[in-house]
Amino acid sequence: MPKVSIITPCYKAERFIARTLESVRAQTLTDWEHVVVDDGSPDDSAQVVQGYAARDPRVRLLRQPNGGMENARNSGFAACSAGSEFLLFLDADDCLEPEALATLAGYLEARPAVGLAYCARIWIDADDRPMEDANRQPLPRFAPAWRGARVLPDSEPETPLAALVAFHLAIPSSCLIRRSVYAQTDGWDERLRRKGFEDLDMVMRCALLAPVHYVPTVLLRYRRHGGNASHVTDLAGDRVPFARKWNRSEGLSRDQVRRVRRAFDFDRFLAAHLQFRAARERVSRRDLRKGLFFWAQGVRKTLKFLLALARREGAS
C-alpha cells in the first residue's frame, strides 16, 4: 500500500497539469499514488493525464461530469487505496519541491499526535517564474497574546486555530493530512463550492481534531494566474455561507464551539489591530516628514544668522 495518497482535482488544467505530475514523479519519497480526477474538463487535460498513467502505474485517472472542486476531491479520496497513511490534496496547477513528501511525511511520522503539517511556499506565475512582490515576506502566523497578538516564531511549529483562521495560512497543496484525522471529517463540504472558504473549512475541521504544525521549509510552488478559482470568486460576499455554517456549530463539542468563537473573535480583532497599526505608521511617517522639514528650516535659519554675524564682525 502507498504511504501517501495524492488527490488532484483537474478542470481546464491542460496548460499546467503535466508540470504538476512531473513534480510528483520527482519526489524523493517514491511510495505514493496519484489520483487525478478529471472534473468534466472541456480541454485535453484528461488526455495528458492518461499519457502519464500509461507510463506510471502510480498515476490513475478518474473521469466524472463536472461537479466542482470539492466534489472532485471527495471522489478522488473515495478512489484512493484504503491503506495509505497520509493525504495530500494537490491542485492541478501547483508543483511540489522534490523533498516535499519525504519532509512532511517524516515530520508526521516523528510526531504521532500531529494531525496536519503544512509547509512554506513560494508564489510562481504561469511561466514558473517566482513572483518577487508576493515572495518578499512570508505570511506571519499571528496568535492571541496577553497584549493582543504576537507573531509565532518558526521555533514554535504548533499553529493554533485562531492563527489558521486569521490569514488562511494552510492551503490544500501545502498540507499533508494524517488519514486517520481526515477520516473523522465529513470530507470536503460541497455546499461551499466556489465560495473561497472551502479550504479553510477543511483545515479548521482538522485543527479541531488534532494539532496543526508549520514546517518552515519551502516545499511548494504555488501558482498564481488568471484562471485560478480564487481569482474569480468574490471572497467578501462568499464568506456568508461559511460563517453561517460555523455559527450553527452543528456537531461540535462545547470546547470546540469555544475554540471556534475565540478564533473568529481574534480574526476580527486582528483585522482592526492591523488597520490601526497601518494608520498609525502613516501618521508617524507624515509627522517625520514634517519634523524633517522644520528641522531643515531651523538649520538654514541658524546658518544664515551665523553667516550674518560673521560678516558684521568682519566689517567691524
Regions found by a protein language model. Give the residues of each.
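Short loop->beta transition adjacent to catalytic acidic/histidine clusters or analogous donor-positioning motifs
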Residues: P2-V4, R25-V36, D44, P57-R60
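A conserved hydrophobic helix/loop-capping motif in glycosyltransferases and polysaccharide synthases
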Residues: K3-F16, T20, Q27, V37
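A conserved acidic beta->alpha catalytic loop
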Residues: S23, T30, D38-Q47, D91, ...
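Glycine-rich, basic loop-to-helix element that forms the pyrophosphate-binding segment
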Residues: Q64-A82
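Short aromatic/hydrophobic "clamp" motif used to bind/position activated sugar donors
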Residues: L87
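Catalytic core of nucleotide-sugar-dependent glycosyltransferases
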Residues: R141-A143, A210, V218-G226, H231-R258, ...
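Conserved nucleotide-sugar donor-binding catalytic segment
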Residues: A143-L235, R239
